[in-house]
A protein has these predicted regions:
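GST-like domain detector, emphasizing the conserved glutathione-binding G-site
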Residues: 1-127
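GST superfamily/GST-like fold recognition
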Residues: 151-154
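A general structural signal marking secondary-structure boundaries and capping sites
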Residues: 78, 146-149
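Amphipathic alpha-helical packing segments from all-alpha helical-bundle domains
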Residues: 127-146
């Protein structure tokens, strides 16, 4: 049975879920629904009151949303591939911390891009600088902790 996933191909969080599924050889488990299609618009808010991408309907009347939660769910479906998440302890908390750091950097990069798409007269350089500073701080954090990361970096 395929799982209904509300998915926008321009959404980096949707792509994050697709990468997780692909790494676990589960890329064919989704039945994609565009939030912009008539069918998607009619059911999205019923399944996900926040109407954010991605959202995954795992059983009738029960959807999970937020890419972090969906990635954990997809990771739990794996069969012949190792988990992306350590089982417990500090290693798990580090992995979740890196995931949060990556999502936060992505949030800031998106906010910076949105600022640049505003009409020039409405742009706020301070906001752009603040968002980019968060991205750079996240990169510096990863650089400092590079020796703690295990496995191949892709």
């Amino acid at each position: 049975m395929k799982l209904k996933m509300y998915h926008d191909s321009n959404c980096p969080y949707s792509r994050k879920v697709l990468i997780m599924a692909s790494e676990h050889q589960l890329g064919d488990i989704f039945d994609f629904v565009s939030p912009f299609s008539k069918a998607g618009q009619e059911t999205l808010v019923e399944d996900n009151p926040l109407a954010k991408m991605p959202a995954l309907v795992v059983s009738p009347g029960f959807a999970i949303f937020d890419s972090r939660v969906i990635c954990r769910y997809v990771d739990s479906l794996r069969k012949n591939t190792p988990s992306f998440y350590p089982a417990e302890g500090e290693a798990l908390w580090r992995a979740l911390r890196y995931e949060s750091l990556g999502d936060g950097m992505l949030d800031s990069a998106i906010a910076a891009r949105q600022e640049l798409t505003r009409p020039k007269e409405h742009q706020m350089p301070e906001r752009l600088e603040k968002q980019l500073a968060k991205v750079y701080a996240g990169l510096k954090c990863l650089e400092r902790e590079l020796d703690r990361l295990e496995g191949p970096l892709t």
